[in-house]
Amino acid sequence: MHVPPSVPGTRARTAHYTSGVSTQPARKSSSSHVEGARSPRIGVIGGGQLARMMIPAAIELDLDLHVLATAPDESAARVSTHVMLGRHDDPEAVTAFARSVDVVTFDHEHVPTGLLHALEHEGVVVRPGPNALVYAQDKLAMRARLSELGHPCPRWWRVETEADLETALRESGGDLILKTARGGYDGHGVMRVEALEDARDWLERGQPLLAEERVPFVRELSAQVARRPGGEIATYPVTESEQKDGVCFRVSAPAPNLAPEVAERARTLAANIASDLEVVGMLAVELFEYPDGRIAVNELAMRPHNTGHWSMDGCVTSQFEQHLRAVADLPLGDTTPTAAWTVMVNTLGSTRENLAEGAREALANDPGIKLHLYGKSVRAGRKLGHVTALGSDLEETERRARAAAHTIVTGDESKE
């Protein structure tokens, strides 16, 4: 299947903001086919930087990208020509938005699964579908399903009571990582637990929790794949990520000194998970690498992911273009790197209120870096943008990327 053009229409030159209200029936369709001569409409729920970075790729593919944002100053809403305002958990807003597009996809995983099932029942095309997306939304469901399928995971426990946690602590040797089953991101919703008292506040909330053994990993890897509705898959080089206070800070592509057989296992694992869960779009499989070369799944994301931002400048086909190709059921693109090494460094929350001066300095210092700012207000620890550097020498390429990011957020030209 593919997404041919549909009814005649023209693209707006300025943003159109509409409220999330509609009395029109849902477009009844079991595929992404649209009729006529207009460009296919791809609807992205969420107005963050991931939706923002899909826009250039949508233009190149002649896709009309529509965004459901909560406010006109969100990252994607600031630059999109088709914006509807409404919350991702408001059934009326989401339904109205879905009825205005041909395919629905996501900037984040937080849309209620029941709402997405209702949309599919009405004939809305949702990619990835709720039966797949639930495994990126609910960590307990993810662990249970991946374990059932035989994919490598850390040892884990479902925790709902103090007795459950005491059992997990005893069986793990008294050292656990406790996670909220839903909603955690960038270090939020995660804590180390060595005694029952450490987690009493979380237990009192009455929500199921995921407890995992504390993995003795040597580093974190990410394997990204894209999958079309018919099953075609494209894999990306496996990357290494560095975290700072639970937030992705640096990504190196490909992962340095990764044994070829480990890289192949990681790519095969990601492809198998995409097939087993029937994911459509991008899938990022975050992995732990053990000292002996074993790998285990950490988390899943069914959308473009921070560990794939390097592909915007360092790959023939970026993850953002690839995601749109997949959800629009277009042939997938080449994932060959365009340089020996690509290093991406996030620009995280700054003491500066405006990054423009630092960005100008960074660009002047190194004309070879690529800069991507998200148009977001400055807040401590917040992802405000990223820089990428490409080169033939890994150490020098990483130095350049780190220096540029440091200059942007501090104005200091010295190496971080």
Model-derived features: where do they sit?
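A short linear hydrophobic-aromatic micro-motif
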Residues: 155, 175-178, 209-212, 283-284, ...
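Short, low-complexity Ser/Thr-rich regulatory SLiMs
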Residues: 225-229, 287-291, 375
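ATP-binding N-terminal substructure of ATP-dependent carboxylate-amine bond-forming enzymes
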Residues: 1-144, 148, 163, 409-411
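Protein kinase-like catalytic core scaffold
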Residues: 234-237, 283, 295-299
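Active-site "cap" helix and flanking loop/linker of ATP-utilizing ligase/carboxylase catalytic domains
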Residues: 264-285, 291, 301-352
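Peripheral (often C-terminal) accessory segments that flank ATP-dependent C-N-forming ligase machineries
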Residues: 12, 16, 25-28, 38, ...
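Active-site nucleotide/adenylate-binding loops and adjacent lid/helix of ATP-dependent enzymes
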Residues: 135-222, 226-273, 401, 405
